[in-house]
Amino acid sequence: MTAPLTLALSKGRIFEETLPLLAAAGVQVAEDPETSRKLILPTTDPNLRVIIVRASDVPTYVEYGAADFGVAGKDVLVEHGGSGLYQPIDLNIARCRMSVAVPAGFDYANAVRQGARLRVATKYVETAREHFAAKGVHVDLIKLYGSMELAPLVGLADAIVDLVSSGGTLKANNLVEVEEIMAISSRLVVNQAALKLKRAALKPFLDAFERASQNGV
């Protein structure tokens, strides 16, 4: 019996916005990862199962073949590297932007002009380093894993680099967006070996995902 394909997803927005794409392929996930303790979830298609992993781990699971394909944000792929993965489709889901934000009243543009050395808190250290280096901005980067907006409020950092959707969280914490680094959306990533060895099994899903993403499903 042929082993089922494995799709790697992370909990939250990406999982929720991938469900309509799976539905377009005629598949439903049998359990909700928010309420189930299981990390391997069956689907209504016996030839597909879903594994739930951290968003930053999706590329690793796919690259090493523990998953045949997965859905990962551009932020994760840029920060952690997706060079060993086939990335056939921008799914146009989980859209947001990666931006620089500072406390309201902080003159970021003037600080940059004056050549000030800024402390920046972010979990996207490599992406932030490349961005500021390209602009000639001097920064000390502080790696955090969450609650980024807190860092400027308690004097840990002058600025943050984080994902922004509506901007509501920034506003609630008296922060303002001063620079967009890149637009973010989630991509389908495929293991290179699986693409060759399991192409017939993968193709219906790749085609359905592509059609659904183009049609705004």
UniProtKB/Swiss-Prot annotation:
Catalyses:
1-(5-phospho-beta-D-ribosyl)-ATP + diphosphate = 5-phospho-alpha-D-ribose 1-diphosphate + ATP
Its GO biological process annotations read: L-histidine biosynthetic process
- Which Pfam family would be a valid example here? HisG
Which InterPro entries does the annotation name? Answer: ATP_PRibTrfase_cat, ATP_PRibTrfase_CS, ATP_PRibTrfase_HisG, ATP_PRibTrfase_HisG_short
Q: Which GO terms describe its cellular component?
A: cytoplasm
Q: Which domain of life is it from?
A: Bacteria
> Is Repeat among this UniProt entry's keywords?
no
Sorted UniProt keywords: Amino-acid biosynthesis, ATP-binding, Cytoplasm, Glycosyltransferase, Histidine biosynthesis, Nucleotide-binding, Transferase
Task: Give the chief site where it resides.
Answer: cytoplasm
Instruction: List where in the cell it is found.
Output: Cytoplasm
Q: What is an example of a GO molecular function annotated in this UniProt entry?
A: ATP binding
Pathways per UniProt: Amino-acid biosynthesis; L-histidine biosynthesis; L-histidine from 5-phospho-alpha-D-ribose 1-diphosphate: step 1/9
What Enzyme Commission number does this protein have? 2.4.2.17
Q: Which comment does the entry carry about domains?
A: Lacks the C-terminal regulatory region which is replaced by HisZ.
Which family would the database say this protein is a member of? Answer: Belongs to the ATP phosphoribosyltransferase family. Short subfamily.
Provide the function of this protein: Catalyzes the condensation of ATP and 5-phosphoribose 1-diphosphate to form N'-(5'-phosphoribosyl)-ATP (PR-ATP). Has a crucial role in the pathway because the rate of histidine biosynthesis seems to be controlled primarily by regulation of HisG enzymatic activity.
PANTHER family membership: ATP PHOSPHORIBOSYLTRANSFERASE, ATP PHOSPHORIBOSYLTRANSFERASE ATP-PRTASE
Q: Outline the subunit composition.
A: Heteromultimer composed of HisG and HisZ subunits.
HAMAP family referenced in this protein's UniProt entry, alphabetically: HisG_Short
Q: What is this protein called?
A: ATP phosphoribosyltransferase
Q: Which gene encodes it?
A: hisG
